[in-house]
């Protein structure tokens, strides 16, 4: 964890199982490829030479997500947010400016790398919200409400845990595993 992303509990549990195992050699093909990919990404960011700093894109992304992919959302708003996130990502790679160099600590470069990650993550968040055709948890899809205005779940379709996989072509695929309830039965919350 680096303070920018929060990891689910499954990741530290997985890593704990690796304690005492032999670390990957810095000369391993995977390690060399990761270093090459990171260097290429940094060089691409430094070469843009645009007019807006990373914080400008970060703020704009927050505005897009707040308006289109917030707690209360609609299909129309999500579709608009998806289009805006994709356009902002293109603008980022065409107009970001990163002051300073890449040979020493550069917080502006760190921010630019994080904003690039956030732009990718934002697209998946919006795709996931579009794909999930129900109201559940803390998220309310306006199209999926009872006549009384309460959230309408769809447990037959969405009683699963899901993760998104990005393919080599940049497309996203949702992977799911069904949930089972053995100790506490699944039930609809009612706050009335």
How would you describe each model-predicted region?
Residues 1-192:
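Glycine- and aromatic-enriched mobile tails/lids
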């Amino acid at each position: 964890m680096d303070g920018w992303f929060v990891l689910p509990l499954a990741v530290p549990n997985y890593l704990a199982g690796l304690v005492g195992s032999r670390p990957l050699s810095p000369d391993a093909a995977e390690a060399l490829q990761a270093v090459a990919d990171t260097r290429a990404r940094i060089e691409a960011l430094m070469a843009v030479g645009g007019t807006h700093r990373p914080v400008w894109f970060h703020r704009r992304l927050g505005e897009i997500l707040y308006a289109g992919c917030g707690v209360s959302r609609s299909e129309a708003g999500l579709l608009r947010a998806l289009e805006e996130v994709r356009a902002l990502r293109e603008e980022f790679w065409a107009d970001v400016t990163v002051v300073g160099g890449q040979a020493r600590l550069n917080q502006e470069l760190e921010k630019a790398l994080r904003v690039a990650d956030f732009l990718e993550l934002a697209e998946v968040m919006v795709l996931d919200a579009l794909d999930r055709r129900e109201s559940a948890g803390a998220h309310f899809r306006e199209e999926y409400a009872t006549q009384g205005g309460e959230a309408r779940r769809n447990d037959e379709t969405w009683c699963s845990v899901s993760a998104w996989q990005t393919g080599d072509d940049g497309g996203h695929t949702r992977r799911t595993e069904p949930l089972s309830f053995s100790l506490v039965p699944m039930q609809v919350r009612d706050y009335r």
